[in-house]
Regions:
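Transmembrane alpha-helices of multi-pass small-molecule transport proteins
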Residues: 1-3, 58, 116-139
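Hydrophobic alpha-helical transmembrane segments of multi-pass membrane transport proteins
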Residues: 1-14, 95, 131, 141-176
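Glycine-/small-residue-enriched transmembrane alpha-helix faces in small-molecule transporters
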Residues: 7, 33, 50-51, 78-114, ...
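Structural motif at transmembrane-helix junctions in multi-pass transporters
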Residues: 7-23, 108-112, 168-184, 207
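Membrane-interface interhelical linkers
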Residues: 15, 44-50, 68-85, 105, ...
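Alpha-helical transmembrane segments of compact multi-pass small-molecule transporters, enriched
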Residues: 23-38, 123, 127, 184-199, ...
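Hydrophobic alpha-helical transmembrane segments in multi-pass integral membrane proteins
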Residues: 33-43, 93-102, 161-173, 220-230
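Loop-to-transmembrane alpha-helix entry segments
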Residues: 41-65, 175, 199-223
Length: 230
């Protein structure tokens, strides 16, 4: 989890938000299918079929429709090693399905999804604490920002939402498999992202829903059906 979140922060200024989402989610889908197909990390093995392959194509197409924004010609030449960063983003995308599978197996050993989440977050917290001391060299936080003003209390609930997300993935993994669990969670993220953008919630700029985004959602829904039923 720490690798994925920190990796996104590294990729955002180099690839932009849209391309970062596209490449990391593609990595998530591919790794989820690999885990299910070969039964890795204690996951229940599921055979790979032609329908699943077509479903993956629909999913990736939908993700691109919903997130990809054409890069400006001027910026295209500034980031020369973009292929390198795309490859890094693809590899970072492997982390969530691996995390979900490991946490689900851990939950089976500990007989508790909540306790497995606690272990996962504790290890992640220690890792982030060390990274903060190494790179930030300070644990101080200012309650106000020069341009953004005072920090609202709602911005501190991210940890609670993360706990709910990780725990629900642990519970769903044995029933849906790594690939489908990742895809369902991803679709929920995208739908909520569209709602937040459309209404400008939580201080984000408004970005209206377009026919391209709706078409992307439809492609993703078709992909999920193909992966689930076949």
């Amino acid at each position: 989890g720490v690798i994925y979140l920190t990796g996104n922060l590294l990729l955002l200024p180099r690839l932009g938000a849209a391309l970062t989402v596209v490449i990391t989610v593609t990595g998530q889908i591919i790794m989820g299918v690999i885990i299910d197909t070969f039964g890795l990390l204690g996951a229940h093995q599921q055979s790979f079929t032609l329908f699943k392959g077509v479903g993956i194509i629909f999913l990736i197409t939908g993700i691109i429709f919903m997130n990809y924004v054409r890069r400006h010609p001027v910026n295209r030449h500034k980031n020369t090693p973009i292929v390198f960063w795309l490859l890094i983003g693809f590899v970072f995308g492997f982390a969530p399905p691996i995390q979900t599978t490991i946490n689900s197996t851990l939950a089976q050993h500990t007989h508790s999804s909540i306790f497995a989440s606690l272990i996962s977050f504790s290890v992640g917290t220690i890792a982030l604490f060390i990274l903060t001391l190494v790179f930030n060299r300070s644990l101080k936080i200012s309650s106000t920002h020069k341009t953004l003003g005072k920090i609202k209390s709602i911005y501190f609930i991210g940890g609670i939402l993360g706990m709910a997300f990780v725990t629900s993935n642990i519970i769903l993994m044995p029933f849906l498999g790594a690939a489908l669990t990742t895809i369902i969670a991803m679709m929920g993220q995208m739908i909520m992202g569209i709602i937040i953008d459309h209404f400008g919630l939580l201080g984000s700029p408004k970005n209206k829903i377009t026919s391209r985004k709706l078409g992307g959602l439809l492609c993703i829904a078709i992909g999920i059906i193909l992966l689930r039923l076949f």
